[in-house]
């Protein structure tokens, strides 16, 4: 699994950088940046791995003896460790700018061996540092840089930015029969835009968005001149994949989630975002179509969705009106999905340690 990693500068970011000589070479110069410990703990709980990466000009020379560096550095590391903060690696470039090395930030030489041994989630990994060289390093690594500033983008602000939920994914699926673009935001509501070419199907998908408390954009070009099969099936596959991607590592989600009455109908939906696709479905219809949607495609939609989303889904409905039967299933699924994707903590809801 790809890992979310924070590559963090030391001087001026984790600890104060002395303005006189820019060297932390005595114990009395060591001072942690405000709020760094509780924020790093929160970021670790949110699933981030930590790597320290620092330039230390002339380390090991007469201008900056190794022993002068080791004392304050070892104390800093001991403080972090005592508070439960673990750095996977501490990467130090000891060279001067004039040495022309490949490991000095913003060059990536110092981090390349680490990257070769670890799968990086580039979309959710960051370089955090107080200098332009840190931002250039982020650009060279193809990840986002966060410019630390004590007065503005400080540790509490960084923690808020990186732990705030805005789970999002986009899937583009193109086959000989359909071209589908699906975009989902699990933590935003309203302003969904859905156009599959099947009016009643659009209405049903909007029920998932509305009752699921999420935003869904779906644009479909399908072979409706033949029938609605490929359009419904491929939309379900793309939507399921997008939901699965947006959930990320699933840390902190409710995972399980509902009985929904609608007029004369009673719909039951049970959902487990388990990583194991399975559908149990029970519904009977009086007619072959509801509006411009084939009723037989309702089961096929949820089967394809559960497969692509990798979830276990149980659905059943009873009632007298086909429109209400179908709509009750989509609404019940939306309400159940709302429960299951809600972030309730910071641990993975599985005794196996993986979903």
Swiss-Prot record:
Signal peptide: none annotated. Its main location: cytoplasm. GO terms for molecular function: histidinol-phosphatase activity; imidazoleglycerol-phosphate dehydratase activity; metal ion binding. One of its GO terms (biological process) is L-histidine biosynthetic process. It is found in: Cytoplasm. Zn(2+) binds at residues 93, 95, 101, 103. Its EC number is 3.1.3.15, 4.2.1.19. Residues 1-166 are annotated as: Histidinol-phosphatase. Keywords: Amino-acid biosynthesis, Cytoplasm, Histidine biosynthesis, Hydrolase, Lyase, Magnesium, Metal-binding, Multifunctional enzyme, Zinc. CDD domains: HAD_HisB-N, IGPD. Residues 167-355 are annotated as: Imidazoleglycerol-phosphate dehydratase. Pathway: Amino-acid biosynthesis; L-histidine biosynthesis; L-histidine from 5-phospho-alpha-D-ribose 1-diphosphate: step 6/9; Amino-acid biosynthesis; L-histidine biosynthesis; L-histidine from 5-phospho-alpha-D-ribose 1-diphosphate: step 8/9. One of its GO terms (cellular component) is cytoplasm. It catalyses: D-erythro-1-(imidazol-4-yl)glycerol 3-phosphate = 3-(imidazol-4-yl)-2-oxopropyl phosphate + H2O; L-histidinol phosphate + H2O = L-histidinol + phosphate. Its cofactor is Mg(2+); Zn(2+). Transmembrane segments: none annotated. The active site is at 9 (nucleophile), 11 (proton donor). Mg(2+) binds at residues 9, 11, 130. It comes from the Bacteria. NCBIfam families: HAD-SF-IIIA (TIGR01662), hisB_Nterm (TIGR01261), Histidinol-ppas (TIGR01656), PRK00951.2-1 (NF002111), PRK00951.2-4 (NF002114), PRK05446.1 (NF003937). In the N-terminal section; belongs to the histidinol-phosphatase family. This is Histidine biosynthesis bifunctional protein HisB. The gene is hisB.
């Amino acid at each position: 699994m790809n890992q979310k990693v924070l590559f963090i500068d030391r001087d001026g970011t984790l600890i104060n950088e002395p303005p006189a000589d820019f060297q932390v070479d005595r114990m009395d110069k060591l001072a942690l940046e405000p709020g760094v410990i509780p924020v790093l703990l929160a970021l670790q709980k949110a699933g981030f791995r930590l790597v320290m990466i620092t330039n230390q000009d002339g380390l090991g020379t007469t201008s900056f003896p190794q022993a002068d560096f080791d004392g304050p550095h070892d104390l800093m590391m001991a403080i972090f460790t005592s508070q439960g903060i673990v750095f996977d690696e501490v990467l130090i470039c000891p060279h001067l700018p004039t040495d022309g090395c490949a490991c000095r930030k913003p060059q990536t030489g110092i981090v390349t061996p680490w990257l070769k041994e670890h799968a990086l989630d580039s979309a959710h990994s960051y370089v955090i540092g107080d200098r332009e060289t840190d931002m250039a390093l982020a650009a060279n690594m193809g990840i986002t840089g966060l410019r630390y500033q004590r007065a503005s983008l400080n540790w509490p602000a960084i923690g808020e930015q990186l732990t705030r939920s805005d789970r999002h994914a986009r899937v583009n699926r193109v086959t000989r029969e359909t071209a589908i673009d699906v975009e989902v935001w699990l933590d935003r509501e309203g302003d969904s835009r859905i156009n599959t070419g099947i009016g009643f199907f659009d209405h049903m998908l909007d029920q998932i968005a509305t009752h699921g408390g999420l935003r869904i954009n779906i644009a479909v070009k399908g072979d409706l001149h033949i029938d609605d099969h490929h359009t419904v099936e491929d939309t379900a596959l793309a939507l399921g994949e997008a939901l699965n991607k947006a959930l990320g590592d699933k840390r902190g989600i409710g995972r399980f989630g509902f009985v929904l009455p609608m007029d004369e109908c009673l719909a039951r939906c049970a959902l487990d975002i388990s990583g194991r696709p399975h559908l149990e479905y029970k519904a009977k219809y009086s007619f072959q179509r509801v509006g411009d949607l084939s009723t037989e495609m309702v089961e096929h939609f949820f089967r394809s969705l559960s497969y692509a989303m990798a979830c276990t889904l149980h659905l059943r409905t009873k009632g007298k009106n086909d429109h209400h039967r179908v709509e009750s299933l989509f609404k019940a699924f939306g309400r159940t999905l709302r429960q299951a994707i809600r972030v309730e903590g910071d641990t993975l809801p599985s005794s196996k340690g993986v979903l």
